[in-house]
């Protein structure tokens, strides 16, 4: 089984969000192998340039055969059970590892969006990127627990 790959731009700097991410990443790993890959933050003050810098790091972290799910406010949101089905299908695909990508404070460059096999929103609202990372990790834990038949999701 190929590991679930979580590719995120930058470190989580807020302590309680960092702790929550670590908690849910550990929880995900109870059910399936998962790795977190941190893409370097862009340094430019210009948002477009910064996203382009970050895109290079994100694209370098992706393997050619990854099934890339990019978090984007314009993507559809999925109920937890549908996310579980998507995760199960991707985990069971021997050729393509699932890779979830979450951007930094300015979002993701078009080059990353173009690389996506699927876009995914966490809901109709916009979340700060650190909170979005926590929510994604929790939803992936919930999806993995649904697939394992665990009682976390009622």
UniProtKB/Swiss-Prot annotation:
S-adenosyl-L-methionine binds at residues 71, 103. SUPFAM superfamilies: alpha/beta knot. It catalyses: pseudouridine(1915) in 23S rRNA + S-adenosyl-L-methionine = N(3)-methylpseudouridine(1915) in 23S rRNA + S-adenosyl-L-homocysteine + H(+). It comes from the Bacteria. Pfam families: SPOUT_MTase (PF02590). It is an enzyme of class 2 (transferase). Transmembrane segments: none annotated. GO terms for cellular component: cytoplasm. Gene3D superfamilies: 3.40.1280.10. Belongs to the RNA methyltransferase RlmH family. Specifically methylates the pseudouridine at position 1915 (m3Psi1915) in 23S rRNA. Homodimer. This is Ribosomal RNA large subunit methyltransferase H. It comes from Solidesulfovibrio magneticus (strain ATCC 700980 / DSM 13731 / RS-1) (Desulfovibrio magneticus). The gene is rlmH.
């Amino acid at each position: 089984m190929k590991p679930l790959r979580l590719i995120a731009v930058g470190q989580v700097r807020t302590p309680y969000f960092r702790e929550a991410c670590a908690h849910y990443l550990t929880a995900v790993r109870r059910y399936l192998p998962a790795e977190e890959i941190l893409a370097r933050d862009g340094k430019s003050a210009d948002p477009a340039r910064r996203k382009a810098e970050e895109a290079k790091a994100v694209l370098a972290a992706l393997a050619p055969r990854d099934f890339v799910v990019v978090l984007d406010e314009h993507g559809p949101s999925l109920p937890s059970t549908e996310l579980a089905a998507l995760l199960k299908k991707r985990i069971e695909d021997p050729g393509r590892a699932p890779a979830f990508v979450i951007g930094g404070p300015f979002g993701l460059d078009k080059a990353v969006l173009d690389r996506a096999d699927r876009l995914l929103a966490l809901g109709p609202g916009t979340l700060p990127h650190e909170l979005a990372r926590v929510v994604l990790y929790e939803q992936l834990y919930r999806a993995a627990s649904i697939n394992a038949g665990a009682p976390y999701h009622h």
